[in-house]
Structures are given as structure tokens and as C-alpha cells.
Amino acid sequence: MPPKFKRHLNDDDVTGSVKSERRNLLEDDSDEEEDFFLRGPSGPRFGPRNDKIKHVQNQVDEVIDVMQENITKVIERGERLDELQDKSESLSDNATAFSNRSKQLRRQMWWRGCKIKAIMALVAAILLLVIIILIVMKYRT
């Protein structure tokens, strides 16, 4: 015959079971259960399995150490990349300033060359004029 279930529970049934369960949990002080959950299984039955767990835990610890080192390296790499980006921006700014200054200097030198050529042409014209005047005066006399 199937078990009979109550369709409706009254408050005494619910609170009574909650109180008794709470009392059992608080009053029963089982160190074995706490040891099991805090330290893991022990004894001859769990020996090889416990060794496997320790081995796996050691591997997990090694992986954690490697990942922490990798994260540290990534952070350092990011810092170096930031420094490199700052240096490249500075270099780009310096290159732009150099380009502008070189264009300005090229113009100055071009004008200076033009001035020197103009002065030389003027001196040559004056010398030629003086020579012509001397020759003309020599033939007039």
C-alpha cells in the first residue's frame, strides 16, 4: 500500500520539524564530520586516493604559480608598452618639429643664396660699369 501524504501541513508540523532539526544540528558536536569536511577523507581506505588528490592539488598549485607569474609578466609588458608608446609619441612630435624647422631653414638658406647672388651680380655690374667708363674716358682723350 502506498504511503499516505498529508495534503496540507499545519504550522505545528513545520515548526516542530524545523526546531528539532535545528536542535540536532546545534547539539550534536561531531568532530569526525568536521574533520572530514575540513581535512578530507583519511584512513587506509582513502590512502591512494588522498595521494592522487595531493598530487592533483600540487599540480593545481604549480599552475596557479605559473599563471601568477604570467599575469605579472603581462602587467610588466603592458607598462613597457605604455612607455614605448609615450616614447614613440615624443619621437613623432620631435620629427614633426624637425621637419617644420628644416623647411624654415631651407627657405632661409635659399633667400640667403639669392641675396649673395644678387650682391655678386651687382658687384660684377659695378665693376663692368667702371671698366667701361675707364675705357670710354681713355678713348675720348
From Swiss-Prot:
Transmembrane portions of the chain: 116-136
A Pfam short name: Synaptobrevin
GO BP terms: cellular response to type II interferon; endocytic recycling; Golgi ribbon formation; Golgi to plasma membrane protein transport; neurotransmitter receptor transport, endosome to postsynaptic membrane; regulation of Golgi to plasma membrane protein transport; regulation of synaptic vesicle endocytosis; SNARE complex assembly
Residue spans, topological domain Cytoplasmic: 1-115
Top-level division of the source organism's lineage: Eukaryota
Bilayer topology term: Single-pass type IV membrane protein
Region ranges (Disordered): 1-51
Compartments (UniProt record): Golgi apparatus, trans-Golgi network membrane
Signal peptide stretch: none
Vesicular side: 137-141
Gene Ontology terms: cellular component: cell surface; clathrin-coated endocytic vesicle membrane; endosome; glutamatergic synapse; Golgi apparatus; Golgi membrane; lysosome; phagocytic vesicle
Phosphoserine carried by residues: S17, S30
Protein name, UniProt field: Vesicle-associated membrane protein 4
Originating organism: Homo sapiens
Family the UniProt entry places it in: Belongs to the synaptobrevin family.
Residue ranges constituting the v-SNARE coiled-coil homology domain according to the UniProt record: 52-112
Functional note: Involved in the pathway that functions to remove an inhibitor (probably synaptotagmin-4) of calcium-triggered exocytosis during the maturation of secretory granules. May be a marker for this sorting pathway that is critical for remodeling the secretory response of granule.
InterPro entries: Synaptobrevin-like, V_SNARE_CC, VAMP4
This protein's UniProt keywords: Coiled coil, Golgi apparatus, Membrane, Phosphoprotein, Transmembrane, Transmembrane helix
Description of how the protein assembles with itself and partners: Identified in a complex containing STX6, STX12, VAMP4 and VTI1A. Interacts with BAIAP3; this interaction is increased in the presence of calcium.
